[in-house]
From Swiss-Prot:
<protein>
    <recommendedName>
        <fullName>Centromere protein S</fullName>
    </recommendedName>
</protein>
<dbReference type="GO" id="GO:0031297">
    <property type="term" value="P:replication fork processing"/>
</dbReference>
<comment type="function">
    <text>DNA-binding component of the Fanconi anemia (FA) core complex. Required for the normal activation of the FA pathway, leading to monoubiquitination of the FANCI-FANCD2 complex in response to DNA damage, cellular resistance to DNA cross-linking drugs, and prevention of chromosomal breakage. In complex with CENPX (MHF heterodimer), crucial cofactor for FANCM in both binding and ATP-dependent remodeling of DNA. Stabilizes FANCM. In complex with CENPX and FANCM (but not other FANC proteins), rapidly recruited to blocked forks and promotes gene conversion at blocked replication forks.</text>
</comment>
<keyword id="KW-0227">DNA damage</keyword>
<dbReference type="GO" id="GO:0051301">
    <property type="term" value="P:cell division"/>
</dbReference>
<dbReference type="GO" id="GO:0006974">
    <property type="term" value="P:DNA damage response"/>
</dbReference>
<keyword id="KW-0137">Centromere</keyword>
<keyword id="KW-0995">Kinetochore</keyword>
<keyword id="KW-0158">Chromosome</keyword>
<dbReference type="InterPro" id="IPR009072">
    <property type="entry name" value="Histone-fold"/>
</dbReference>
<dbReference type="GO" id="GO:0043240">
    <property type="term" value="C:Fanconi anaemia nuclear complex"/>
</dbReference>
<dbReference type="GO" id="GO:0000776">
    <property type="term" value="C:kinetochore"/>
</dbReference>
<dbReference type="GO" id="GO:0006281">
    <property type="term" value="P:DNA repair"/>
</dbReference>
<dbReference type="Pfam" id="PF15630">
    <property type="entry name" value="CENP-S"/>
</dbReference>
<keyword id="KW-0234">DNA repair</keyword>
<dbReference type="GO" id="GO:0003682">
    <property type="term" value="F:chromatin binding"/>
</dbReference>
<keyword id="KW-0498">Mitosis</keyword>
Length: 135
């Protein structure tokens, strides 16, 4: 096996192990809450299905971005991916709106800081703020 293939296989195995761990943890939480048990085979099957679905999502997201002549996946691609599930689409849209609002707030805060704090010096005798000239 070539070195690149070995690295890819190793990375895939680590991702599968991580997915299996998370699925196992979630199944344990549900089992504790609902007082039921999950067999190891059920957890393994859920893990495998989850991993394959994530692979499918990743490929679709890459294709959506490539179709739009971009190399970066953005929120519109994720929304397009979730279009078939109304509840998932609504949740992703809500999260997207929150992220956009937070991003806008951060930009406004930075803008205010640069406008008010960037070109100001203090006059120590009178303790007043004097704007510096931009000459």
């Amino acid at each position: 096996m070539a070195e690149g293939q070995e690295e890819h296989f190793s990375r895939t195995q680590r991702l599968k192990a991580a997915v299996h761990y998370v699925v196992g943890s979630l199944c344990q939480e549900v089992a504790d809450d609902k007082e039921i048990d999950f067999s190891k085979q059920a957890i393994a099957a859920i893990s495998e299905i989850t991993f394959r679905q994530c692979e499918s999502f990743a490929k679709d997201l890459e294709i959506f971005a490539r179709h739009a002549k971009r190399t970066t996946i953005n929120m519109d691609d994720v929304k397009l991916l979730a279009r078939r599930s109304r509840s998932l689409y609504a949740h992703i849209s809500k999260c997207s709106d929150e992220i956009a609002a937070n991003s806008l707030e951060q930009k406004e805060k930075k803008k205010k800081k640069s406008v008010s704090g960037g070109n100001v010096s203090r006059n120590s005798d009178m303790d007043t703020v004097v704007p510096e000239s931009k000459d």
